[in-house]
Structures are given as C-alpha cells and as structure tokens.
C-alpha cells in the first residue's frame, strides 16, 4: 500500500482509541500482500493482561468497530483487506515495559551471552528489582531449580511460552 508508513501511526492511534471499550490495544500493525490485494493486519492484545487469550467474538467486535473508520482515514480507491487478529499466545516481548507485564508468566529466553553457564531456558519471570534493574527468572535444568538475575539488555530474544 502506498504511503503505509505515513498512515501507520494514524491507524495505531485510531484503532487504540476505538478498542478501549473492549479493553484491547494494538500490539503490531503490518502491511502484507495477500494474493493481489494489500492487507492491513492489526494484531491486538488485551490491555489489562498482555497474554490473555482472545476469543473469536471479541475479534469480530474489534473489526466492526474499526473497519469503517480505517476506510475514512485511508481514503483510497485501491482494494485492501483488513484483518484484526490476536497477537498470539507465544508473542515476542519487545521491551522492558512489556516484560514487567509478564511477571509470573512462563517465558522462553535467549541470552546474548552465557550467564552462570546458561544461554537459553524456559521459566517463570518471578520478580523485578528496580534498584538493580534486573529480572529474576526461575527454571529447572536437569531437575535442579535455578534462579537467574538478568538485565533486559542482556536478553537477545524473549517470548511468552506454553508450558506443557
């Protein structure tokens, strides 16, 4: 879609405002090609509980709330598809603020460098120490419980995970 990057901020603001009534917020906005049409994909999450599963009914309500307003904002004769979807149960945690919302949640973590002989793990985010700016993770390696204090900058990649 032409000028998508210039519209992205406006779409984000508009959608966040409209979805407040459903306790939803934008996680990410993408412009994709689907067959020969442009697609605007808006990934949303619960604004109160970041990793709360969203059901199909609430996504339909979200689509109904924003569809016409986005048409008015974009004002294009080109055809495009609008998709409102959940950001997913294993979505990436992209910032320290998002990680703070993941306290007591099960996550998958890759570190930039080994810390105490650990480079990656799955475990709980158990606490945050604002004085040392570190998160404590609790996990098991070979049946042994481990706790690891990590600064957000030492994390290469982190996402929510499903514990089996």
Swiss-Prot record:
Keywords: Cytoplasm, Ribosome biogenesis. One of its GO terms (biological process) is translation. Its main location: cytoplasm. It is found in: Cytoplasm. Belongs to the RimP family. HAMAP family: RimP (MF_01077). Required for maturation of 30S ribosomal subunits. This is Ribosome maturation factor RimP. It comes from Mycoplasma mycoides subsp. mycoides SC (strain CCUG 32753 / NCTC 10114 / PG1).
